[in-house]
Amino acid sequence: MNAKIKYRAALVGCSRMGAFIDNESSDPALSPYSHAAGYTKCERTDLVACSDIRTDVMKIAGDTYNIQEKNQYIDYKKMILEIKPDIVSVATQPEQRAEAVIFAANNGAKAIYAEKAMSASQDECYEMADACIKNNVAFNLGTNRRYDSGFNSMANFIKKGNLGKLKTLVAYCTGSLFNMGSHNFDLLLKLNNESKVTSVTADLTEFIWDSKSKELKADPTGQGVIEFENEVKAYAFNISKATKWDAICENGVVSAIDNGGHFIVRAKNKKYLLDFEKTSSTLNLIYDLVASIDNSKSYLGGIEVSVKSTEIIFGFIQSHLTRSKVRFPFTPLDIKLNRDFKPRTPRYNR
């Protein structure tokens, strides 16, 4: 395929991560950060349309990213059918994510960039995967650390065995499961070379559960243990407000601190430096999707790894509800996230 071809992108959800999170960061290494900014920066994509049920938010996003008014839609389904985009970004909340992803996959999208968490229920997650696989649609989840050059350098360093065999992984600030846990679980999978999960055990707090409807009314926070097929254990804690991670190997430790701003290798009698150029994880994710369309295969991401990290979220919830270890693969309980909250107004300016 001609490497100069440009893919046409359309955005579903024009709020914070969709279009305006760039205004919250002063770190140039993070830019572009939002979906819209990423497509605008990438020379292989054109952002041609957007959709949001809030017309005021959509108009400002359209003005910001030079999207013609006729290509701004309240109804995302109409947008996909009329615009026929190559790439669809779904930057909604998880409660609305599955319907939009499945519709895009079934109606001509070549690739989908979906925000995390992947879905509001485990069944929805599998339905999304089925639609993407059936239609040969490339899929990347917005777990940005997977596409971060620093964390990729860390993962490759561990994989090379410089410090011997990986034994233990620790995340110190797992956060709430759908918002931050989705990032953390995906990163733990990445650092452990995508090894299969064999079980999880979790204890959750801030757990608002409607037993009649079997719905979570808030994003739960908690901690737990993830066991892998290669005998590595990962501990997902909430014991620090600082976002940091340790990879404990036979002969040393690799640490990511300051949310991946710095990486430290501690090894007896040896000095190592993780050498990498800091680049935008959003832009890397989009380039990865473009390569997936070009060559009909997944690279850094894909639907399979997205499903694996989502299963950990629901495994944690199921472990808490049943007060037991959940062994993978498992039959999911009928659990769904269904919050009642008002959308926040994004920050339109720096």
For the regions a language model picked out, list residue spans one by one.
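C-terminal helix-rich "cap/oligomerization" subdomain common to oxidoreductases
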Residues: 1-6, 11, 45, 51, ...
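A contiguous active-site-proximal alpha/beta segment in oxidoreductase catalytic domains
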Residues: 87, 113, 118-182
